[in-house]
Amino acid sequence: MAGIGSRRIVIEVPEGLRVPPGELEKRLRIELALRLYEKGIASLGQARKIAGLSKWDFLELLAREGIPLHYSEEELKEDLEVAKKLAEK
């Protein structure tokens, strides 16, 4: 879904891919997100949005795929802020 700061693209794929009916778009989004993250083109947040997954689901997917984390200082600060807020509750 295109929104602020995003762009919609259309691609053609060959018929006969071994993907269950109705799963093609989801599978392509996940594969694209994984590869863009793996190559350092997309951040964790950008990649998980492309994949349509929560941060934690995307982290689990990265682990299953054997893709190491590219954890930036900014992401660490964000996670520490969340942890502090949760600890205060």
UniProtKB/Swiss-Prot annotation:
Lineage top rank: taxon: Archaea
Family affiliation: Belongs to the UPF0175 family.
InterPro entries: UPF0175, UPF0175_domain
Signal peptide bounds: none
Pfam families: UPF0175
Cystine pairs: none
Protein name: UPF0175 protein APE_0276a
Species annotation: Aeropyrum pernix (strain ATCC 700893 / DSM 11879 / JCM 9820 / NBRC 100138 / K1)
